[in-house]
Amino acid sequence: MVASVPLRNVSHLLSVLRSQNVPRYLQNGVPRDVLLFRHERGRFFAILGLFCAGQGIFWTSLAVAALSRPLSRVPAEAPNRSYQDLRSALWRYGLAVGCGTMGVLVLGAGLLYSLRSVRSVMLLAGGQQVTLTTYAPFGLGTCFTVPLNQISCMAHRGEVPAMLPLKVKGRRFYFLLDKAGHFPNTQLFDNTVGAYRSL
């Protein structure tokens, strides 16, 4: 009799879990496209794109200016003229390389951040495909569709303070979901895109 009580409780628990909507929803596939996440920050990414473009132009113009004009003219009769010319050339080329590197880093960081920040996540009808929409440079947006089994959420929504990292198989770097965004269907998100998978 004592052994039958836990068995009855377990069977009751299993029947309750089977009656929940989400597992049945996932087994049969979703009948239509379901929005799982949305976060609109198009204006921010437009400003970020303009800032990065301005920084790229600024650092490139500094590099061109460093290459085009020598810092100082060395008189022809000056002693050690060849040493001073070398120092001036090394200084100019070093400054040009440094400025060019700064411009490339700022542009690359802005481009990477805008391409990896997620605007929306849509679970397509059938429940086997997911469409991720990211902010492209200047907030123009780009989207791609991947199978659900190729997406892994690296942390639960409650574990991270600001950004939720998503790993997509075959793509470098994580995709970032801002927790300030809207999760219209949290239970379905946690059971599909928000689940951890070893890729």
Swiss-Prot record:
MF-aspect GO terms: mitochondrial ribosome binding
Native organism: Mus musculus
Keyword Mitochondrion: yes
Keyword Transmembrane: yes
BP-aspect Gene Ontology terms: mitochondrial cytochrome c oxidase assembly
Protein keywords: Membrane, Mitochondrion, Mitochondrion inner membrane, Transmembrane, Transmembrane helix
Topological domain spans for side Mitochondrial intermembrane: 65-94
Stretches assigned to the Mitochondrial matrix side: 1-43, 116-199
Name used for this protein in its record: Transmembrane protein 223
Main subcellular localisation: mitochondrion
A Pfam family per the record: TMEM70
Membrane-spanning parts: 44-64, 95-115
Subcellular location: Mitochondrion inner membrane
GO CC terms of this entry: mitochondrial inner membrane; mitochondrion
Subunit structure as annotated in this protein's UniProt entry: Associates with the mitochondrial ribosome.
Function according to Swiss-Prot or TrEMBL: Mitochondrial ribosome-associated protein involved in the first steps of cytochrome c oxidase complex (complex IV) biogenesis. Stimulates the translation of MT-CO1 mRNA and is a constituent of early MT-CO1 assembly intermediates.
Topology with respect to the bilayer: Multi-pass membrane protein
UniProt similarity note: Belongs to the TMEM223 family.
InterPro entries the record matches: Tmem223, TMEM70/TMEM186/TMEM223
